[in-house]
A protein has these predicted regions:
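N-terminal maturation segment of proteins
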Residues: 2, 6-247
Length: 247
């Protein structure tokens, strides 16, 4: 009797795994059965592609041992434009495969909105790849990165403190990627309004000519580390590490 129960249990588990495998294969490598599932998948992939977004949401932090998102930043890469074009083209192609006759009224409207959004994004990436200003007087990457780390990155334990330092160490690589984008923008003859330069130069000067006691990455990091109630030796160690990362 026990053997039969174990056999049936084993078969049910294998069946469940097989069905799950078929569903996931269909979801990621074919046109999913449901347009809702397809759009949900795209939303999740968009979030997973941005370590900052995963930190903002917070629910992924418990899986950081797997995702490692809390120690990463979105670094501009040379092939970002090409990858975005391919992604949007694939999304549009898949959306058009869903026949309106098989969709509810809500799904039809969702399909129209999704296609409109994807086609607009594709047009922007193809025709206007350099028409945004990554450095500006309001919320450029130089300000947003500092604000994100000081305000949004959680430090609830030593692991997250170490991740903070890893992210600060990545800022130089991030700025190098942004600089490459700015050079391409300049080669295309696209420049922000002149008044932006003075604001950005002043903002960058504040980060370059700093005292540690005034730098938000230093002050916020130490404040959060002190709340962990670590030993004085560990606090001193982390203080030295964040100084090195900022330099």
């Amino acid at each position: 009797m026990i053997k039969k129960i174990l056999k049936y249990t084993k078969n049910l588990i294998l069946l469940a795994l097989s069905l799950a495998g078929i569903y996931l294969f269909n979801l990621f490598f074919m046109k999913p059965f449901s347009i809702d599932h397809f759009l949900g998948k795209e939303l999740v992939l968009g979030l997973v592609d941005s370590p900052e977004a995963m930190t903002y949401i917070g629910i992924f932090d418990r899986f950081n041992w797997l995702t490692r998102h809390n120690s990463k930043l979105s670094i501009p890469e040379k092939d970002d434009q090409e990858n975005s074009i391919k992604q949007y083209e694939q999304v549009i192609k898949t959306l058009y495969k869903y026949e309106d006759s098989s969709l509810s009224e809500v799904q039809k409207n969702t399909k129209k909105i999704a296609i409109f959004d994807a086609e607009n994004n594709l047009k922007q990436v193809k025709e206007f790849p350099h028409h945004d200003y990554p450095l500006n007087q309001i919320g450029g990457i130089h300000l947003n990165t500092i604000e994100f780390l000081s305000d949004m990155h959680p430090i609830r334990n030593e692991s997250e403190a170490k991740d903070f330092i890893k992210r600060v160490n990545l800022i130089k690589k991030l700025y190098t990627g942004v600089l490459a984008d700015l050079e391409e923008q300049a080669d295309a003859g696209i420049f922000p309004p002149e008044f932006v330069y003075d604001h950005v130069i002043n903002q960058l000067s504040d980060f370059i000519n700093y005292n540690y006691d005034e730098h938000p990455l230093y002050t916020q990091f130490l404040r959060k580390v002190k709340e962990l109630n670590l030993s004085i030796e560990k606090e001193k160690l982390y203080e030295e590490q964040i100084k090195i990362a900022i330099d």
